[in-house]
UniProtKB/Swiss-Prot annotation:
Ca(2+) binds at residue 500. One of its GO terms (cellular component) is extracellular region. InterPro entries: 6hp_glycosidase-like_sf, Glyco_hydro_47, Glycosyl_Hydrolase_47, Seven-hairpin_glycosidases. This is Probable mannosyl-oligosaccharide alpha-1,2-mannosidase ARB_00035.
Length: 509
């Protein structure tokens, strides 16, 4: 049953804002939608606490909660992905009880044992990133009054994890395999790896080297990255800076000529500029490659719906032609352009990023639930017959209608708000949060849904991914919380940079 509230374990105060003449469901909705800005951080904490309580009650110590069936699931090695992914958000929200629960859990993880094949990419961004971020946020900060010994365990566990993962780089090129059998220290034997799965390791592994004074971790990821920075053959770099999505592990050569900012490619480009934020002096080449990719994206992948020329999306390039489709996953791109524009003092990148933010906002604003779909298109030649009027009105049609609590649209709203100061983007974040809360809440958490363009989101599909804690709730909270070292600055040098799982990593001094 659809809940029209965001009442978590500590949000009874919200009901007091309701009009007594309205029924309970209505007044809870009004209370959430109409909260004053100063009350919004607590409402977001309440959402976190509601989901956390459900996880701890029904799923701990498994990876994730199924918030409809109230069961646990282990899609991420069975080490408790939700606690590790939630740690940095709990620190930022100032939730000491949750932080201490998570620190106790982490101390018990044995990373050498798992019954499942492991993704190097997912394990790096969620577990390794979560551990390093927790350490960066807590070490010598006095935050949460955390036990210093428990804080030190975070770095110890990060080293343990990297040590059981590093065999993945044992190829003739140093390009890692992604699918690993950790107990046997073997790979699945795949001959290729993806652009993002190779190119989204360098921040976490480099930071681990900096924290431990052991160069090997960063060198492993940076050696693999060199093949992405110097793509061969050049024919598979379809436009300057934009490369294909698959690379041969044994030869280091790209296997196809394509380009996109979608899943599978996305966070490679994201990390190019973020490594420059991490250390401008050491990663200038990464920045140069990002600039090439950004310029080529504007020139070759920018696209607008026929009837909505003021709407801007980024398409993909395949088989020598522009593909007019995109994904929720790709909607991080607006924030990445905004970050790059601010970092490089290149206002043309910031302006383009804001156009992308506006385009992705329209995928939310035009659906029944006010949540954007998993994937969408705008090719006037491929409009589904049952979406003709929707396409005319909105400028896009829905290819995949589900929503799995993804953060990317809110993430880009956050960057837009922090860099411009325009409260419009803050309002858009709150609108999205209200819509997600209204549509996805269950008695024990928040659930993925089947159809963003159907009443009540269609059906609840029983997944609460760990990134809902790490990313979706964090970016929402940050937009309404006070200035802090981990916030993106409007200008100047950031003290932290977010990994692709929204874990704040302290930049080099």
């Amino acid at each position: 049953m659809k809940s029209l509230s965001l009442l978590g374990v500590s949000s009874l105060a919200l009901t007091s804002l309701a009009l007594p003449t309205m029924n309970q469901n209505q007044h809870r909705f009004v209370a959430l939608a109409d909260l004053a800005d100063e009350d919004k951080p607590q409402a977001i904490k309440d959402a976190f606490n509601h989901a956390w309580k459900g996880y701890m009650t029904h799923a701990y110590p498994m990876d994730e909660l199924r918030p409809v069936s109230n069961e646990g699931s282990n899609p991420l090695n069975g080490w408790g992905a939700t606690p590790v992914d939630a740690l940095s958000t709990a620190i930022i929200m100032g939730l000491p009880d949750v932080v201490n629960q998570i620190l106790d859990h982490i101390s018990k993880i044995d990373f050498s044992k798992t019954d499942d094949l492991c993704s190097l990419f997912e394990t790096t961004i969620r577990y390794l990133g979560g551990l390093i971020s927790g350490y960066d946020l807590l070490k010598n900060s006095g935050a949460m009054n955390a036990d210093p010994e428990k804080v030190d365990v975070l770095l110890k566990k990060a080293v343990e994890l990297a040590d059981v993962l590093k065999f993945s780089f044992n190829s003739t090129t140093g390009i890692p395999s992604n699918t690993l059998n950790i107990p046997k220290q073997t790979t699945d034997g795949a001959t290729s790896n993806g652009l993002a799965t190779v190119g989204t390791l360098v921040l976490e592994w480099t930071r681990l080297s900096d924290l431990t004074n052991k160069e090997e971790y960063g060198k492993l990821a940076q050696k693999a990255e060199e093949y992405l920075l110097n793509p061969q053959p050049k024919s598979n770099e379809v436009f300057p800076g934009l490369v294909g999505g698959s690379i041969n592990i044994q030869t280091g050569k790209f296997e196809r000529a394509s380009a996109s900012w979608e899943g599978g490619d996305d966070s490679f480009y994201e990390y190019l500029i973020k490594m420059y934020v991490y250390d401008r002096s050491a990663f200038g080449k990464y920045k140069d490659r990002w600039v090439l990719a950004a310029q080529s994206t504007i020139e070759h992948l920018k696209s607008s719906p026929l009837l909505h020329p003021d709407t801007t999306f980024v398409g993909a390039w395949a088989n020598g032609a522009l593909v007019k489709s995109s994904q929720h996953l790709a909607c991080f791109d607006g924030g990445n352009f905004i970050l790059g524009g601010r970092e490089l003092n290149r206002p043309e990148f910031t302006r383009f990023g804001l156009k992308l933010v506006d385009g992705c906002h329209k995928t939310y604003a035009n659906t029944v639930t006010k949540i954007g779909p998993e994937s969408f298109g705008w090719d006037e030649k491929n409009v589904p017959s049952d979406q003709a009027s929707f396409f005319t009105k909105s400028g896009f049609y829905i290819n995949s209608s589900g929503y799995v609590l993804r953060p990317e649209v809110i993430e880009s709203f956050y960057y837009a708000y922090r860099v411009t100061g325009d409260k419009k983007y803050q309002r858009w974040i709150w609108d999205a949060f209200v819509a997600i809360s209204e549509t996805t809440k269950t008695d024990s958490g928040f659930s993925s849904i089947s159809d963003v363009n159907a009443a009540k989101g269609g059906s609840k599909t029983d997944s609460q991914p760990s990134f809902f804690f790490a990313e979706t709730l964090k970016y929402t909270y940050l937009a309404f919380s006070d200035e802090a070292d981990w916030q993106i600055s409007r200008s100047g040098k950031d003290k932290f940079v977010f990994n692709t799982e929204a874990h704040p990593i302290r930049v080099r001094n």
